[in-house]
Amino acid sequence: FSFFTFMGYALIILYGIALLLIFAYSVLQLSLAINYRKTKKERDTRKRPDFNWDDLPVVTVQLPVYNELYVVERLIETVSQFEYPRDKFEIQVLDDSTDETVEVIAKKVEEVKARGIDIVHIHRTNRKGYKAGALEEAQAVAKGEFIGIFDADFLPNPNFLLETIPYFDSDDIGVVQTRWSHINKKFSLLTELQAFGLNAHFSIEQGGRNAA
């Protein structure tokens, strides 16, 4: 029983294990695809729940950022354009930056605040807990009954809150996550492949899990 014989058996066993894992993953993906297909028509015709628009809840939007010099102004401006009652809308810019992003945010926040929007710049220097820590600390002083979170590269539509908040009228709903789109999908073959993978994840995988 030589060393090479042992290695041969070991490789066969590892190959068999890899095949089993691939098979199990394929079965899981197939089941998600079947669930997605079964409920596709229902999702396509689903309407936004009825909601009492005179009794909208207060919403706080949190924007956690770290050294996002080139995109942070775009993010703040996009969120400031949300279609929502100004007296029920708060923006928290959670800034853990260590570069000139801090000054860029401060200037943009003052500009947005001058338009009558409730926005606050929370800058930390200790970075305790990193992103999760920033969100937790800010939540303690948030005014909103509901929290929306957007990363620095997000560009949510102006009607985002009006389209999502009504779902919370159901006691069965605790979290709402929406599907992403891609502003640079056609930039290169790599970005097209990345967009394809993310689209499959949100539509088939998440849709299938939700239907299960």
Name each model-derived stretch.
Residues 31-88:
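N-terminal signal-anchor transmembrane helix
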Residues 63-65, 95, 150:
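Short beta-strand/turn micro-motifs composed of small residues
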Residues 109-145, 158-212:
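Long helical/loop segments within the catalytic core of UDP-sugar-dependent glycosyltransferases
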Residues 97, 135, 151-155:
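The conserved acidic donor/metal-binding loop of glycosyltransferases
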Residues 77-122, 127:
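Acidic donor-binding segment of Leloir-type glycosyltransferases
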Residues 71-78, 104, 134-137:
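Well-ordered alpha-helical segments embedded in enzymatic catalytic cores
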Residues 1-55, 206:
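N-terminal membrane-anchoring/stem segments of glycan-assembly enzymes
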